[in-house]
Amino acid sequence: VFCCMVTPPNRQGFVNLGLTNFYSMETIKAGRASGKQRLTIGEVNDQMPVIFGDNWLHVSEFDFFVENSSPMPVFSRVQPGEAEKRIAGHVLELINNGDTFQMGIGAIPEAVVSGLSGKHDMGVLTEMFPIGLPDLISKGIVTNSRKPFHKGVTVATFCMGDKAMYDYVNENPVCEFYPASYTNNPAFIAQHPNMVAINMALMVDFSGQIGRASCRERV
């Protein structure tokens, strides 16, 4: 059984995956293609934003729908401390005008986003849509004009933030979401010159290996 939240169907009978694509679309299509008995359930939420890109599925891909009307979960912006700001200062020295960046979640990426105010013509190819990105776009810092693909468009897989962010991405043609197999494909990422990835680390060993998913009991 696979269940995911979707928007109400449009006039053509397509629902939208909204705030998160990840592997939902490919899981549903792979289940259909396998020929095995699998149930696909869509939770229709009329408060789910509609986000463009490869983010649509026809109602025929689902076996059942259930209706719900509840607000999206909201997450406040992380407030970087002095240490995070100093680390971000070193990171910002490695980011140049016209670079395409990927941003993770956490205090350091948040500090980096805040420090990009002096840059211009930045592009975004990322898994997570950063919470501070709408400000960068409105100020002309992020234009996506120099990317070899999806010019003028921010490409991501999911977003988690506050209501202002959800209102921003809703039916906004400069934001497109795609499955993670597309945004996170190393071969696709490698075709972007001057690609910069900024993520948090939970631990680093003496050989320089970095762990970012778990550290002892912390995940």
Regions from the PLM with identified roles:
Residues 1-218:
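Conserved alpha/beta enzyme-core scaffold
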